[in-house]
Amino acid sequence: LVTINSALEVDLTGQVNAAQSGAAYMGGTGGQVDFVRAGMRSPDGHSLIALASTAKGGTLSKIVATLAGPVTTARTEVDVIVTEFGAAELRGQSLAERTRRLIAIAHPDFREELDRAAHTIRTRGV
């Protein structure tokens, strides 16, 4: 079984927000976690979270240092994140490796900024 869900944003640890964009409520979790778990627990199964790398005409990265909205799917439940720049397999990876893989599938215009944010988070705990 392979499940595919969408997201509004994903942070550098792999946490997924699929419910709220800024102050605008976009929808409930709608069983996303159930589908994610089903895909991951099925023999040879996978769970994909798919999203465009940017929003607002390319001016806003959807892979972010920290979520602006609530966590819909916890990082421990996330298997694979997919953008138009590739797939980041996160299951079983360290936080540092998750961060590296997510930056690699972010829009190229935002990778340096995300790398700096990741460095700040690692060194300052911010």
Regions found by a protein language model. Name each.
Residues 1-126:
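Conserved phosphate- and dinucleotide-binding cores of soluble alpha/beta proteins
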